[in-house]
Design a protein with these regions (language model features):
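N-terminal accessory alpha/beta regions
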Residues: 2-90
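Short low-complexity stretches enriched in small and charged residues
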Residues: 63-68, 94-104
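Generic hydrophobic, aliphatic-rich segments that mediate packing or membrane embedding
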Residues: 74, 78, 93-96, 105-108
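Aromatic side chains
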Residues: 82, 97, 111, 165-166
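Short Cys/His-rich Zn2+-coordinating modules
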Residues: 85-98, 121-128
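Short, glycine/acidic-rich beta->alpha junctions
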Residues: 92, 101, 131-135
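Short cysteine-rich loop/turn motifs with clustered Cys
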Residues: 98-119, 143
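Glycine- and acidic-residue-rich phosphate-binding/metal-coordinating active-site segment common to enzymes
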Residues: 116-177
């Protein structure tokens, strides 16, 4: 695993950029109402990531897209914010997506060190932790093998993998195999 520089995007600006592309006025209003709750969750993420205990977040149930996650925002709405407003090439959040992809030195996957970066991995999966779907500190450039291999499991104490933005330098100097 290789450490990479943590993104320097303000989470509030990224959230606002993504929500600015929403065409449905009712949905945009609901995201605006949920904004302080999402920003509080983003702050909690940074605190937990610094302490290496992201496993402490409660995961959403598997497959229930209507589950309310934050304020009155459903799991599907939070996941769609990422896919519709950050991944889509014509949307405002795409600039942040592209900048995150460029964080991997030489375009190499920080998880395996071999594969070419081709996607962003949600460190806490968007299907289980959708509140963090557009949080740049949760989005790691990765190769498709590492992204799909990690899957969407629920983190538990003792099973949390290394986080490329939050690990100490020692991870790059100690042989792992």
């Amino acid at each position: 695993m290789k450490r990479i520089r943590k993104p320097n995007f303000d989470p509030a600006v990224v959230l606002d950029t993504c929500t600015s592309g929403i065409n449905d006025p009712e949905l945009a209003t609901r995201f605006n109402a949920a904004r302080p709750y999402l920003l509080a969750k983003f702050h909690d993420y940074e605190r937990c990531a610094d302490a290496h205990n992201l496993f402490s977040f409660d995961a959403c149930s598997w497959g229930n897209e209507t589950q309310v996650v934050v304020a009155d925002m459903s799991k599907k709405e939070l996941v769609d914010l990422y896919s519709d407003q950050m991944v889509a090439s014509s949307k405002p959040g795409r600039k942040q997506y592209d900048s995150l992809m460029m964080l991997a030195p030489l375009g190499k996957c920080p998880f395996c060190g071999f594969g070419q970066v081709s996607t962003l991995d949600h460190f806490l999966s968007k299907s289980r932790y959708p509140a963090f779907s557009v949080l740049t500190f949760n989005l790691i450039p990765s190769c498709s093998d590492c992204n799909t291999g990690k899957g969407s499991s629920v983190l538990e104490n003792g099973t949390q993998i290394l986080h490329p933005y939050y690990e100490d330098a020692v991870v790059e100097t100690v042989p792992w195999l």
